[in-house]
Amino acid sequence: MRLPKEGDFITIQSYKHDGSLHRTWRDTMVLKTTENAIIGVNDHTLVTESDGRRWVTREPAIVYFHRKYWFNIIAMIRENGTSYYCNLASPYYLDSEALKYIDYDLDVKVFADGEKRLLDVEEYERHKKKMNYSNDLDYILKENVKILVDWINQERGPFSQAYVNIWYKRYIELKNR
């Protein structure tokens, strides 16, 4: 599979552990690809839910996916500052159809003022039982929550305002070509 290039548009598909399609984002612009990571941007991107409902993202958001970490990061650029929505999820897989990952329900939200919240713990526990998450998977996900919180606290990668500014500026340059 050829890696997408800067300026290409890709589809993103999230699945649940049982293989069911959860959500699809159409036309995410790729800003950078490396052997292990893809950085992109969603800006007024069409999102389709598994039940067929559709909506459009409200603000530009830098998205970060990695082949080794069990999370992905969405940096939402808003008037009052950058806030983050982080999905605990499998490392991504890329094929000719889309960038794909499994969403494991647990989420970390970081507000523009720095407040952090772990979300959807009950949903995670419910799906863990229903979809038979293994003990190994449970351990991996909980360890990756710790890694993610360390990244947040250290303002590493996507959690650095300089990172967000650089990639947003690059998006504007590509958009205005």
UniProtKB/Swiss-Prot annotation:
Pfam families: DUF402. Keywords: Hydrolase, Magnesium, Metal-binding. Mg(2+) 1 binds at residues 87, 103, 107. It catalyses: a ribonucleoside 5'-triphosphate + H2O = a ribonucleoside 5'-diphosphate + phosphate + H(+); a ribonucleoside 5'-diphosphate + H2O = a ribonucleoside 5'-phosphate + phosphate + H(+). Mg(2+) 2 binds at residues 105, 107, 120, 123. One of its GO terms (molecular function) is magnesium ion binding. It is an enzyme of class 3 (hydrolase). Its cofactor is Mg(2+). Disulfide bonds: none annotated. The keyword Chaperone does not apply. It comes from the Bacteria. The active site is at 23 (proton donor). InterPro entries: DUF402 (IPR007295), FomD-like_sf (IPR035930), Ntdp-like (IPR050212), SA1684 (IPR016882). Its EC number is 3.6.1.15, 3.6.1.6. Belongs to the Ntdp family. Has nucleoside phosphatase activity towards nucleoside triphosphates and nucleoside diphosphates. This is Nucleoside triphosphate/diphosphate phosphatase. It comes from Streptococcus gordonii (strain Challis / ATCC 35105 / BCRC 15272 / CH1 / DL1 / V288). The lineage of its organism: Bacteria, Bacillati, Bacillota, Bacilli, Lactobacillales.
